Amino acid sequence: MDEWIRQAVKYANGAIWNNGSWGVRNMRGSETSLSVHATGRAVDLSYRKTEQHPTANRKGAVAFLNIVIANANALGVECVLDYFPQKFGRGYRCDRQAWKSYSKPEIHGAPGGDWHHYEITPAMADSPTLVKQAFQRVFAEIPQ
């Protein structure tokens, strides 16, 4: 996962930063279900502008996110959550290959959250080499 995060931050050109990855904890709002963060396969990438991250911004984060979604299989992406949109955020899942706008509270932090949550496959989480190759293939075709 660490390499996936490094590559994401690199190719997003300063629009995002690591707001949290590995941590053994339950899903927000649940007392019984572990978060995917506890498996080492999830990261929250923030676009919140801070003193340490002066170039972070939603426009760049969404541009990066759109490339990732268009290449989700190649990048090993299983799920992306976008906490910002009204009323209840939205989620992308690999099993439906599409976004779903939530019509009721389903993700803790929506609406208005300033980060995207990414979940990746075990194979990608465990192989820095695969991650580097995938990002290089996907982003080599896109002018920087």
List PLM regions with ranges.
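Glycine-rich loops and low-complexity Gly/Arg-rich segments
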Residues: P105-G109, P143-Q144
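Low-complexity, Gly/Ser/Thr/Pro-rich intrinsically disordered linker/tail segments
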Residues: T121-Q144
